[in-house]
């Protein structure tokens, strides 16, 4: 059956700031306390969406979450009106304010793990929300992510959205950032590659930085998504590269159809994994980048592998990269050699995503890949699909509500909270989502 990959990109939120919340993510740590530009960040992301949509790649948008997220501050013991809660936490425990104001939901590669209908036992598209258990600021995302996905994929005959796994370290799940799908045409059954960093009873794990994904979580997600057991491979990421800042697999590998583009040191027991993929995926091609050409450090600093590998109708592929790759002589030299070599990659497309990159999120972090048949695509909430009208409406919306400069100190401003709620109220109507945010269901949450 014919099917297409639709990229659902996260829209950067109004409180995008640099707080260094993500230990193990070196860009996040390096840019801590710098001032950010939320308006520019949102526009950089929108421009990528629109460019790819104009180039013929189906594209949609996932909206930001409510931030600062007052209900969690109340759970932490701060009371009074919303304004009083903000004032108290800013004075007594400002680190909590930064955590509950994070715009990290923009990296929707971590929102969920997807199983296309061609891979599932019941013939539905399955989406399992990620619990993002390893980082407090990200663990807050799952309930609203679930509401948003149910509002976008609202046809229960075709889509099944599963709640996140229990919030315990044993079941740490980071979503599609640790998941690849390999195969022929999108509509054909594919091989799902789940990548984990640690498993109970296995001493092979990183020592410097945390392994965020567990094998136990990956296995549970595969079960929830009803993936045909014959179409699943579980593989461990190389713990040494996690310790060098590769906190998700999509920082060291990206797949599309029959191609796996990865670093030579991406996986533990890499040669066995590639042999298994060759045996199970028709026409499988591994493009392994040697450490002598690109070091792991350079891969992390440029986000070479946090790229999007997109298929054109003629079978050729385009690699979507952050500007940092073009600015690194060694990486750019390698990429031009890659273009000249015998493989499907025939074009490089570069985007300026500096605002997201400074927090450790490149092109692949910003998108959730969902393979859909034509019938399934028609069943998606049409208001989220990118086109000229939506692009212009979202740009105007960003101009109206977003600040062009934000520091951690600004997060205590009650006006920022009010601006954010008003903006999301308007956005949820624009995207026909209904009342997906807690403040909409609780009448503002004051008290």
Curated annotation (Swiss-Prot):
It comes from the Bacteria. The active site is at residues 174, 248, 365. GO terms for biological process: arginine catabolic process to glutamate; arginine catabolic process to succinate. It catalyses: N(2)-succinyl-L-arginine + 2 H2O + 2 H(+) = N(2)-succinyl-L-ornithine + 2 NH4(+) + CO2. Pathway: Amino-acid degradation; L-arginine degradation via AST pathway; L-glutamate and succinate from L-arginine: step 2/5. It is an enzyme of class 3 (hydrolase). The keyword Cell division does not apply. Homodimer. This is N-succinylarginine dihydrolase. It comes from Escherichia coli O7:K1 (strain IAI39 / ExPEC). The lineage of its organism: Bacteria, Pseudomonadati, Pseudomonadota, Gammaproteobacteria, Enterobacterales. The gene is astB.
């Amino acid at each position: 059956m014919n099917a297409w990959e639709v990229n659902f990109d996260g829209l950067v939120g109004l409180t995008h700031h640099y707080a260094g919340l993500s230990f193990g993510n070196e860009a996040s740590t390096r840019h801590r306390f710098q001032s950010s530009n939320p308006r520019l960040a949102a526009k950089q992301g929108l421009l990528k969406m629109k460019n790819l949509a104009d180039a013929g790649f189906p594209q949609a948008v996932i909206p930001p979450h409510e931030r600062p997220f007052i209900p969690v501050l109340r759970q932490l013991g701060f009371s009074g009106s919303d304004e009083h809660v903000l004032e108290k936490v800013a004075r007594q425990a400002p680190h909590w304010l930064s955590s509950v104001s994070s715009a990290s939901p923009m990296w929707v590669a971590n929102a969920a793990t997807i199983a296309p209908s061609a891979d599932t036992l019941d013939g539905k598209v399955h989406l399992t929300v990620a619990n993002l258990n390893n980082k407090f600021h990200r663990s807050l995302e799952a309930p609203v992510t679930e509401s948003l996905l149910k509002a976008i994929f609202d046809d229960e005959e075709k889509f099944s959205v599963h709640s996140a796994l229990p919030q315990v370290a044993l079941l740490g799940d980071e979503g599609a950032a640790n998941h690849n799908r390999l195969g022929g045409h999108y509509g054909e059954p594919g091989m799902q590659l789940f990548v984990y960093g640690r498993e109970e009873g296995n001493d092979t794990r990183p020592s410097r930085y945390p392994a965020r994904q567990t094998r136990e979580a990956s296995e549970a997600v595969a079960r929830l998504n009803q993936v045909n057991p014959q179409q699943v491979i579980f593989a461990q990421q190389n713990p040494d590269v996690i310790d060098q800042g590769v906190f998700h697999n999509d920082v060291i590998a990206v797949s599309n159809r029959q191609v796996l583009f990865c670093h030579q040191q991406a996986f533990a027991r890499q040669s066995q994994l590639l042999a298994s993929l060759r045996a199970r995926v028709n026409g499988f091609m591994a493009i392994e980048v040697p450490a002598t050409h690109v070091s792991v450090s350079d891969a992390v600093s440029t986000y070479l592998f946090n790229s999007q590998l997109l298929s054109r109708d003629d079978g050729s592929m385009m690699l979507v990269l952050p500007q940092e790759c073009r600015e690194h002589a060694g990486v750019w030299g390698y990429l031009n050699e890659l273009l000249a070599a015998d493989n499907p990659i025939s074009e490089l497309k570069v985007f300026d995503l500096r605002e997201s990159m400074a927090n450790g999120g490149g092109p692949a972090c910003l998108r959730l890949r969902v393979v859909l048949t034509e019938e399934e695509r028609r069943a998606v909430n049409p208001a989220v699909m990118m086109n000229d009208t939506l692009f212009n409406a979202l740009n105007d919306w960003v101009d109206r509500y977003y600040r062009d400069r934000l520091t951690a100190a600004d997060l205590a401003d009650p006006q920022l909270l009010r601006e954010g709620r008003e903006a999301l109220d308007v956005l949820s109507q624009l995207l026909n989502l209904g009342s997906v945010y807690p403040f909409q269901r609780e009448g503002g949450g004051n008290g």
